Regions:
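Bacterial N-terminal signal peptides
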Residues: 8-20
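Sec/Tat signal peptide C-region and signal peptidase I cleavage site
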Residues: 21-25
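Short, charged beta-turn/beta-strand-edge "cap" motif at the junction between a beta-strand
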Residues: 42-43, 139-140, 206-208, 321-325, ...
Length: 385
């Protein structure tokens, strides 16, 4: 029997057989909102609860300390974020509420299992999702980069009258997913790399053919995501039909996520709350709210789940707004592409901020035979400035 199955049975057994006193003692709400994440503590990936974006509670250690009191029955702490997400709605969230309430009510911020955020490494929260699904061109302003106000209004009205269905694509997970503070690496010779800030919806409950009205029942929470993109395309020759989405979206470090996850009960309706921005070296290049979305989050979930079963820990990103690098090129305000040494800050209000430095890969092994992806300039010339 797998660990997750055993934990599910333990939680279910607790609910059925626990004494009335224990049931009454169980926390049904958290005194304060919290976030969840994965952190490097003493060199080990550790599941933690985030309070006020300042304190990190080591869940396993805090759970052990809590269970010293016989009022709290034994529950296995989740070993990783995928396990936490999968068990959250099966009773685990109430133990997390108890941990938070114990820290807050007893002023345990100085306990050994509570750490300052500056003293830990912030890792990608989910290591790793089984799939990342991204919505392409899902904001009206992104669908009309470089448009005049009149053109944008006309194009928006036209699209609203015929929205069709969403366009989704997959990004790699391990290798592509990085946490806040890790470098975004521009692959060797690829000089047309751009940014996109997106809301990342974390699935909490498995489902196939999930209708839009039931979509939020399958959501665990929300984090900040980025869809870093290579706009250099593939070289000529060979099979060249259509866009090469793997080249465009599939490089290492091209899926930043985090810095942590806000469980849905602490965020509210994302279609009302969403406010996302992206800043490069102090200059705001993207800013959008949910009203700019072409297909809303429940519709994206319904569409995605009509194609493939969604599982706990899967990530669905809702797309980006205008203000990308490609849009800056069209407006002739400079290349708009990322440059080594720049610092990116991608923020969603109420969730947090991803911070990344851009670095360039300096070289490649000398024994490559020529089958590798070549530098963009070798077939498209230098990137425009």
């Amino acid at each position: 029997m797998g660990r997750i199955t055993r934990l599910t049975l333990a939680l279910a057994t607790l609910a059925v057989f626990a004494s009335p006193a224990l049931i009454n003692a169980q926390a049904m709400s958290s005194d304060v909102p919290f976030k969840v994440g994965t952190f490097g503590i003493d060199g080990e990936p550790t599941v933690g609860l985030v309070l006020r974006d300042a304190l990190i509670i080591d869940v396993a250690a805090a759970n052990t300390a809590l269970e010293v009191d016989p009022m709290y029955p034994h529950i296995d702490a989740p070993e990783d974020m995928l396990e936490l997400i999968g068990q959250y709605e099966y009773g685990l969230k109430y133990r997390l509420y108890e941990i938070v309430n114990n820290v807050v009510r007893n002023d345990l911020s100085g306990a050994a299992y509570v750490h300052r955020v500056d003293d830990v490494d912030i890792l990608a929260p989910i290591q790793y999702p089984s799939k990342i699904m991204n919505a392409a061109v899902n904001f009206y302003t992104h669908a009309c980069e470089g448009c005049s106000a009149e053109d944008l209004a006309a194009r928006t009205q036209q699209r609203q009258e015929d929205r069709g269905v969403p366009y989704l694509f997959l990004k790699p997970t391990r290798g592509a997913v990085i946490g806040s503070g890790e470098d975004i690496v521009m692959p060797y010779g690829r000089d047309r790399i751009e940014w996109e800030v997106e809301m990342a919806i974390v699935i909490g409950r498995a489902g196939k053919y999930v209708s839009a009205p039931r979509a939020y029942d399958h959501v665990f929470g929300y984090m900040v995501g980025m869809d870093v993109s290579d706009r250099g395309g593939r070289p000529p020759g060979g099979y060249g039909s259509g866009s090469d989405w793997f080249v465009g979206k599939g490089h290492d470090s091209f899926a930043p996520q985090g810095p942590w996850i806000v469980p849905k009960e602490f965020f509210g309706d994302p279609m009302e709350q969403l406010h996302q921005t992206l800043v490069i070296d102090g200059v705001t290049v993207q800013e959008a709210r949910a009203g700019d979305m072409i297909h809303n989050i429940p519709e994206l979930i319904e569409y995605a789940s009509s194609l493939i079963t969604l599982f706990p820990g899967d990530v669905l990103q809702s797309g980006t707004s205008g203000g990308t690098g490609a849009g800056r090129v069209e407006r002739a305000t400079g290349s708009g592409y990322l440059q080594a040494g720049e610092t990116i800050r991608a923020t969603i209000e109420g969730i947090g901020t991803l911070v990344h430095t851009v670095v360039a890969e300096e070289g490649i092994p000398e024994d490559l035979t020529g089958a590798q992806l070549p530098p963009t300039a070798s077939y498209r010339g230098p990137a425009p400035r």
